[in-house]
Amino acid sequence: MPAYRSRTTTHGRNMAGARGLWRATGMKDADFGKPIIAVVNSFTQFVPGHVHLKDLGQLVAREIEQAGGVAKEFNTIAVDDGIAMGHDGMLYSLPSRELIADSVEYMANAHCADGLVCISNCDKITPGMLMAALRLNIPAVFVSGGPMEAGKVKLQGKTKAVDLIDAMVAAADSKVSDEDVKVIERSACPTCGSCSGMFTANSMNCLTEALGLALPGNGSVVATHADRKRLFVEAGHTIVDLVRRYYEQDDASVLPRNVANFKAFENAMTLDIAMGGSTNTVLHLLAAAHEGQVAFTMKDIDRLSRRVPVLCKVAPSVADVHVEDVHRAGGIMGILGELDRAGLIDTSVSTVHAPTMADALERWDIKRSKSEAVRTFYRASPGGIPTQVAFSQERRYDELDADREKGVVRDLEHAFSKDGGLAVLYGNLAQDGCIVKTAGVDASILKFSGPARVFESQDAAVEGILGGKVVAGEVVVIIYEGPRGGPGMQEMLYPTSYLKSMGLGKACALVTDGRFSGGSSGLSIGHLSPEAAEGGNIGLVRTGDLIAIDIPNRSITLEVSDEELAKRRASEEAKGDAAWQATGRKRNVSTALQAYAALTTSAARGAVREVKRRSN
């Protein structure tokens, strides 16, 4: 029987000092026999997805204590990728994932916590906490702050749903008036919550449902709706039950590595492909699998991408569908239900809220559930009132979207595409692979060939696109923006948005060793591995070189002879210490970022750190 970790600090004569300190936090004699649960919050006023979380940690804490545990809350950092976008602030986004994972490990291990409730929401926070939970392998439950409501704007007599990406594209489009830009800007992000499309934050919160570590609705019910409060309440009770099952009943099945096992990672990636999730999820799932010692790799993602269809299309892949609409269609359990009927997922895996995924779907899939409460839950709708307050409205749709032929979520027979929403491409330009969000690529450019236009930074690419240096038919190549070369592997949301605003969204491709925001769409191919800073062939591309992209056949080819590439490589390596570095940019790289660059690995491995372990 495993011993409660917390008893290291709460039991025994020699722990009198530690108990004295625990007492100073409010603990009483009776509390020293209870499990201590870490409530990992990520409240900050910098991020709309986290601005409403301040009191929610204490909501969970109260429920933990009512269920017989002791709750102790702490905070992690949280970076807003949208605010950090387009300047050197984006260098810090991906590295913050490692800091978040480390901070959770430090706090949980330093204080010997018995379990975790992870309150996350935005882009790197959910992945960082997921990595920590799998690294620590103590009972854990995830609950997110929830999606933002989509904005509504009336232009030219028509009302349309808008989001952050619409504001960015409109601002860069000279044909849109200043007044219209201002109207869109003021409407794009109306409430607290993670940005309203199937961007990285919402994608990851959806995937925690598929991994079995979060409660149904975690990824889809909007932050403002009263129904989301139930998730926080249930998380508090659920974690105490899981902790007792592990420490008192020796039930190791509840541990994160046994819940989020290889089959669960396959399920999560299958969901991601079916809903056209953010390409960043590939990076984060690989990193989480690494922490959980799960042998899940790019090869598995490639294999799954070849057999999973697109059953759901959400912004930015389509303009008028947001995560709130997915919730009305049955949420993530609705999509998983269709994948189950198609024989594409393994429902024998366990979850933190049901013995198996099959049991969970029996209750939560609206196409099979007999529960009126479940159907009512999935009718939770946006309130339509700007607010930063969680659980502030109780509006509901009159009816569910259960149409699997033409609705937001489709069945296999009526799939948007038989080919999946994400694909892994290989070739001499990406020997270890690269990622494209096929759900956001127009069918007319699934095969594309054109001359390269090379830039050594995102900033230079933006200047080139807006300055008219990029023309239709070209492949924009942005190099030295990978995990090590950036460092930090910046998101390229501005270049993709500006290609759209310049009328080149369907006329150009963009290829980079950096990554893309979940808000990016178009023929945007990222994560090229090996990256330029590691000596990858992408660092040998020259303006004018022909690049051929063939998504149906999963290939990306630099049409330059092996002999010429060898000459270029020899010339580069002759530079010695100055080799494989950007020469045409000035960038202030802090000590913190230099430390990250020294330890990080390629995108094909999730950009995890590689540290030589000392033998003790």
From Swiss-Prot:
<dbReference type="InterPro" id="IPR042096">
    <property type="entry name" value="Dihydro-acid_dehy_C"/>
</dbReference>
<dbReference type="GO" id="GO:0016836">
    <property type="term" value="F:hydro-lyase activity"/>
</dbReference>
<comment type="pathway">
    <text>Amino-acid biosynthesis; L-valine biosynthesis; L-valine from pyruvate: step 3/4.</text>
</comment>
<dbReference type="GO" id="GO:0000287">
    <property type="term" value="F:magnesium ion binding"/>
</dbReference>
<dbReference type="InterPro" id="IPR056740">
    <property type="entry name" value="ILV_EDD_C"/>
</dbReference>
<feature type="binding site">
    <location>
        <position position="81"/>
    </location>
    <ligand>
        <name>Mg(2+)</name>
    </ligand>
</feature>
<comment type="subunit">
    <text>Homodimer.</text>
</comment>
<keyword id="KW-0408">Iron</keyword>
<dbReference type="GO" id="GO:0009097">
    <property type="term" value="P:isoleucine biosynthetic process"/>
</dbReference>
<dbReference type="InterPro" id="IPR020558">
    <property type="entry name" value="DiOHA_6PGluconate_deHydtase_CS"/>
</dbReference>
<protein>
    <recommendedName>
        <fullName>Dihydroxy-acid dehydratase 1</fullName>
        <ecNumber>4.2.1.9</ecNumber>
    </recommendedName>
</protein>
<feature type="modified residue" description="N6-carboxylysine">
    <location>
        <position position="124"/>
    </location>
</feature>
<dbReference type="InterPro" id="IPR000581">
    <property type="entry name" value="ILV_EDD_N"/>
</dbReference>
<feature type="binding site">
    <location>
        <position position="491"/>
    </location>
    <ligand>
        <name>Mg(2+)</name>
    </ligand>
</feature>
<keyword id="KW-0001">2Fe-2S</keyword>
<comment type="similarity">
    <text>Belongs to the IlvD/Edd family.</text>
</comment>
<dbReference type="GO" id="GO:0051537">
    <property type="term" value="F:2 iron, 2 sulfur cluster binding"/>
</dbReference>
<dbReference type="GO" id="GO:0009099">
    <property type="term" value="P:L-valine biosynthetic process"/>
</dbReference>
<keyword id="KW-0100">Branched-chain amino acid biosynthesis</keyword>
<dbReference type="Pfam" id="PF00920">
    <property type="entry name" value="ILVD_EDD_N"/>
</dbReference>
<dbReference type="InterPro" id="IPR037237">
    <property type="entry name" value="IlvD/EDD_N"/>
</dbReference>
<dbReference type="GO" id="GO:0004160">
    <property type="term" value="F:dihydroxy-acid dehydratase activity"/>
</dbReference>
<feature type="binding site" description="via carbamate group">
    <location>
        <position position="124"/>
    </location>
    <ligand>
        <name>Mg(2+)</name>
    </ligand>
</feature>
<feature type="binding site">
    <location>
        <position position="195"/>
    </location>
    <ligand>
        <name>[2Fe-2S] cluster</name>
    </ligand>
</feature>
<comment type="function">
    <text>Functions in the biosynthesis of branched-chain amino acids. Catalyzes the dehydration of (2R,3R)-2,3-dihydroxy-3-methylpentanoate (2,3-dihydroxy-3-methylvalerate) into 2-oxo-3-methylpentanoate (2-oxo-3-methylvalerate) and of (2R)-2,3-dihydroxy-3-methylbutanoate (2,3-dihydroxyisovalerate) into 2-oxo-3-methylbutanoate (2-oxoisovalerate), the penultimate precursor to L-isoleucine and L-valine, respectively.</text>
</comment>
<keyword id="KW-0456">Lyase</keyword>
<dbReference type="Pfam" id="PF24877">
    <property type="entry name" value="ILV_EDD_C"/>
</dbReference>
<dbReference type="InterPro" id="IPR004404">
    <property type="entry name" value="DihydroxyA_deHydtase"/>
</dbReference>
<keyword id="KW-0460">Magnesium</keyword>
<feature type="binding site">
    <location>
        <position position="122"/>
    </location>
    <ligand>
        <name>[2Fe-2S] cluster</name>
    </ligand>
</feature>
<keyword id="KW-0479">Metal-binding</keyword>
<feature type="binding site">
    <location>
        <position position="123"/>
    </location>
    <ligand>
        <name>Mg(2+)</name>
    </ligand>
</feature>
<keyword id="KW-0411">Iron-sulfur</keyword>
<keyword id="KW-0028">Amino-acid biosynthesis</keyword>
<comment type="pathway">
    <text>Amino-acid biosynthesis; L-isoleucine biosynthesis; L-isoleucine from 2-oxobutanoate: step 3/4.</text>
</comment>
<dbReference type="GO" id="GO:0005829">
    <property type="term" value="C:cytosol"/>
</dbReference>
<feature type="active site" description="Proton acceptor">
    <location>
        <position position="517"/>
    </location>
</feature>
